[in-house]
Amino acid sequence: MNNKFFKLIFYLALLLSCTPSFGAKWKAKHVVFIGLDGWGAYSMEKANMPTVKQLMKDGSYTLEKRSVLPSSSAVNWASMFMGAGPELHGYTEWGSKTPELPSRVLSHYGIFPSIWGLFRDANPQAEIGFFCQWNGLEYLAEMKAMSKEMHVKAEDDPSGKADKAVATHSCAYIERKETSFRRHFL
């Protein structure tokens, strides 16, 4: 019995010595956050979107996210950015520019804390680009935390398409800057 026990311990120790360190943490060099407003996860299975599917395969994503109520753009984007529901951040309407309810907490940027301000505070030298098509997003993020922010319009691209303009300006920015956290919305 003792012989089997020692063999088990030996092989377990050998196995553990061959694995990477449990304490080692992988850190991404860059983070790109892409949000698509109004896109239902139910469409993914039949969608012919090889680029998006490749990004999903190589990155991190969820198809399980549910809308907060009321299900409108500003309320849901605020909830994703801020990691809290409307009862805490206070945004309750589609085009909210300021919270309809008083925010439970305010960051030093003057709005409920979000990933953008928290990331900037943790990484003061980081390059953070913020490009969006819908100008309503500008009220839901700490714009003073951004290195570059741009509300892109359809006329900003020769194609006349706003989503193409967001991609064009975002790519140009990424090529010019060594960005840490990028946010692009189509």
Spans of model-derived segments:
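Bacterial N-terminal signal peptides that target proteins for export
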Residues: M1-F10
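Bacterial N-terminal signal peptides
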Residues: I9-S17
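Active-site nucleophile/metal-coordination loop of metallo-enzymes that catalyze phosphate/sulfate
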Residues: K25-A28, G40-D121
